[in-house]
Amino acid sequence: MLVLSIRIKVWQTMESEITKRIVVPELEDILYKEHKVLDKGFVRLVDYMGSDESVVQAARISYGRGTKSVSQDAALINYLMRHSHTTPFEMCEIKFHIKLPIFVARQWVRHRTANVNEYSARYSVLDHEFYIPELDHVATQSEDNAQGRGNSLSNEDAQYVTDLLKRDSDMVYETYNKFLIKGVSREISRISLTLNYYTEWYWKIDLHNLLHFLRLRSDVHAQYEIRVYAETMLEIVKKWVPLTYAAFVEYCLESQSFSKSALSVVKKLIAGEDVAREDTGIGKREWRELMDVLADNK
């Protein structure tokens, strides 16, 4: 009983101490909470290091932290973001626990600037959980984008597709179970499963590279199934580093960059000149994108 009493006393002392690390109350409120994504997936914040304060502290290391106001911190972060000074943003890190379909994970790991540890089907048995898209997300192949969707299928055709997906997903899991019952190794049994089965991982990344990931994967041209994860994570970033998030939206997420030729077109249009695409050397796709931006049709 004496040992137990001492342990309780030590634990109570540890709980009563105030941490000296930077704490963001808005993130403390959502630590370990699941944010549902797709039909069975989720994003869960596991840990974080730093805040907006860490960014400005790193940027001001040459002359100390000083006594700066929030407006001055915001102005500095805006400057860093506008001029692509990335190192200060690398001082913050965040770790997520994510559950996602395997085909989404394969896109995700193309971003090689994170630390990843994935659930291993060599050591553990996978659950009978697979992704089935909602009917309005079952679409034709895009005619002008080799990677993208076109128009949605009719409800009847979409239902046909999802019914087949469910049938095949159930069938391959039954095969997977038969292999396991027969004593086939897990690392061989798993290869029968399809790409819509769910996996899980821990994913840790610094703020700069996270923002790069989110800029690409939250874009309207990104595949829907990865975009919804990015949108969920953006909301977490907004709580974590609100000044950095505001600068990111202003200078990256909702801004536009132009090629030299496109900028020349913009200048001529501002000057009231008529401009034909054929006279600019700009390709059809870039021209269409430029006109969409100028017409605010995106």
From Swiss-Prot:
Signal peptide span: none
CDD domains: ThyX
Record's keyword annotation contains Flavoprotein: yes
Cited InterPro entries: Thymidylate_synthase_ThyX, Thymidylate_synthase_ThyX_sf
Ranges spanned by the short sequence motif ThyX motif, renumbered to the chain: 110-120
Binding site for FAD: T87, R110, H111, R112, E118, D206, L207, H208, H212
Active site per database record: R217
HAMAP family: ThyX
Name by which UniProt lists this protein: Flavin-dependent thymidylate synthase
Annotated source species: Ehrlichia ruminantium (strain Welgevonden)
